[in-house]
Amino acid sequence: MGLPALEFSDCCLDSPHFRETLKSHEAELDKTNKFIKELIKDGKSLISALKNLSSAKRKFADSLNEFKFQCIGDAETDDEMCIARSLQEFATVLRNLEDERIRMIENASEVLITPLEKFRKEQIGAAKEAKKKYDKETEKYCGILEKHLNLSSKKKESQLQEADSQVDLVRQHFYEVSLEYVFKVQEVQERKMFEFVEPLLAFLQGLFTFYHHGYELAKDFGDFKTQLTISIQNTRNRFEGTRSEVESLMKKMKENPLEHKTISPYTMEGYLYVQEKRHFGTSWVKHYCTYQRDSKQITMVPFDQKSGGKGGEDESVILKSCTRRKTDSIEKRFCFDVEAVDRPGVITMQALSEEDRRLWMEAMDGREPVYNSNKDSQSEGTAQLDSIGFSIIRKCIHAVETRGINEQGLYRIVGVNSRVQKLLSVLMDPKTASETETDICAEWEIKTITSALKTYLRMLPGPLMMYQFQRSFIKAAKLENQESRVSEIHSLVHRLPEKNRQMLQLLMNHLANVANNHKQNLMTVANLGVVFGPTLLRPQEETVAAIMDIKFQNIVIEILIENHEKIFNTVPDMPLTNAQLHLSRKKSSDSKPPSCSERPLTLFHTVQSTEKQEQRNSIINSSLESVSSNPNSILNSSSSLQPNMNSSDPDLAVVKPTRPNSLPPNPSPTSPLSPSWPMFSAPSSPMPTSSTSSDSSPVRSVAGFVWFSVAAVVLSLARSSLHAVFSLLVNFVPCHPNLHLLFDRPEEAVHEDSSTPFRKAKALYACKAEHDSELSFTAGTVFDNVHPSQEPGWLEGTLNGKTGLIPENYVEFL
């Protein structure tokens, strides 16, 4: 029920009904007044709360903006960069939103609080004042009326008329006040319908504007939100794979820590307790010590994990001798004494165990070492990049593209291991290797075929993209600019050997076809990168850092798939020069110890001095020009070459011969001299000039001189007979009775001085085995039972009871 209307005619009657109606209107005004007061109070509390909320959100945004993600590794993937940038994006959105909130709060006081206060004070307050006046006039009118009615009729007529006139005036004034009051009450009741509600509407409009601004921010944020969601999902997927790899490595380290020890530049390193003499007795201080065998340098860093840091300055000494302490000569166990060249007295050290002391002793006294004899963690098989290998890959690709290109989870779902091995044994059987490429029967499941393809690539002696280029590929993936990544990877691919590049092109063309059907098989470019990254760029050693680089391996594969036509069908824009190739090899050799397979297949390779390498290149180039113009000019060029060979050059590194099974099956007829020729080291001392000493010089020294001096002749006359080259050498090379054996029977010439079976030999250089049939060793290792092998350029010897192959030019006979 609404309020009854106040009629002006009722003011004259001033009936009880009028009074009741007026009271109901007055009660409504009181109710409205109280409500507005409470509303203003709540509105102020709301504004204060909004200010506190805005302040808290700004502080939250500032915290987000200040935090910086630190990822493992020296670079971040695109996904990691997107995630790392997300906190700053969140902070920006929140700040923008709070700026709009502050504007809304400032307007709220003007559009809500002030109008309500004004309405309550001016309108309702005026009605209250009118009521007071009305009540006062009512009381006055009623009093005068009662007094007037009590006048006696015996009064004079003039007095009665005057009293009547006075009552009429008071009544008239009362009626006017009553009419004005009724008018004001009705006015306030009508005004509150808009003057009270309108500020609330304006406040809500400001609130809606704030929310709409948030909606617009959300729309603008949508693209980044989608990108971030994808990056988070990709990172989560990589985390699952990385976690399993790290957990597997952790279990291997638990089972055998020494076998999976990382390659270190130090011969030996670890914690030792060093005895320090004090004024009153001695104390044992914990040090982290490193030892380099080549320089005989021992570095001692005082460090205790319990105290949380270093306890002094580092100290380095040069080792003179190392002696084990007798058990009865000292109370401590596992002790040994070290004498230094540049420090007087004896340094007594305590190892952590008997085995630890044995390793330190063997490292320092030149005994046969057992450190760093890590087995290659990669599974090596009989797979090769030969005609059979290409046939196997083509068969698998043909079967996949004809029968299973749309199968979901292609290459991600693995086949049964026994079936995979059986299929590989069938494909690798030489009896069936020459069959057509479509002879994989339909009985083999697609997942078995795809697993066989991946397994064969993992069985190769080295990854398809080669160990020595792995760091370069990873660095290319870490470049910020996408074009730079593609360009660098393009250049690196064209530095791969021809067979590797052909196989990689074959594989990438196939993976591009798979990715083109990703709507059916669900294998996007990113998914294929996850599958093939660790296979094509598998690390040389299992470490946490290598596992963390898997994400960049995946990026490399993604780039190869997406840009396979450009990378494999076009030449790089800026091909690398020889000097750049040399620098890249030098950086690679500086960053980690090279394995045997990583040494380049050249006669000599400079690993320290770029200037000396360029000098030798200029000498060889001049010899090439002389040979091309006149073969007899070799006599002139030899005089300029001989002084360089007579000088002892420590920068000349011996190159390990290439195993025959790792060579291409059909070398090009136009290629340089076959690398299956034995290679020789440069002489370590100047060659004698007298005929007597020349006759007695080792064949190996003469061979080294011959190879270096006439490299140009050999390259220029590759198609001519070897005896023609030999006839040119006779004119300027000191006569040696076995020189012709270098060309007729190279193995016999090399082994003439070592024809006696079961001799001992000493390693001149360190080498890490790349095959199970090879031996790993360091410089100074002594081999037993050394004798010629069936493979050119290799010897067989025994080390620690194991017999295997040794690069011939890595050792000298004792």
Swiss-Prot record:
One GO cellular component, as annotated: focal adhesion
Name of one Pfam family that matches: RhoGAP
This protein's record includes keyword Cytoplasm: yes
Manganese in keyword set: no
Residue numbers carrying Phosphoserine: S668, S671
Domain SH3 residues, every copy: 756-814
Post-translational changes noted in the entry: Phosphorylated in a PINK1-dependent fashion promoting retrograde mitochondrial trafficking and clustering.
Keywords tagged on the record: Cell junction, Chromosomal rearrangement, Cytoplasm, Cytoskeleton, Disease variant, Endosome, GTPase activation, Membrane, Phosphoprotein, Proto-oncogene, SH3 domain
Annotated protein name in UniProt: Rho GTPase-activating protein 26
Gene, per the UniProt record: ARHGAP26
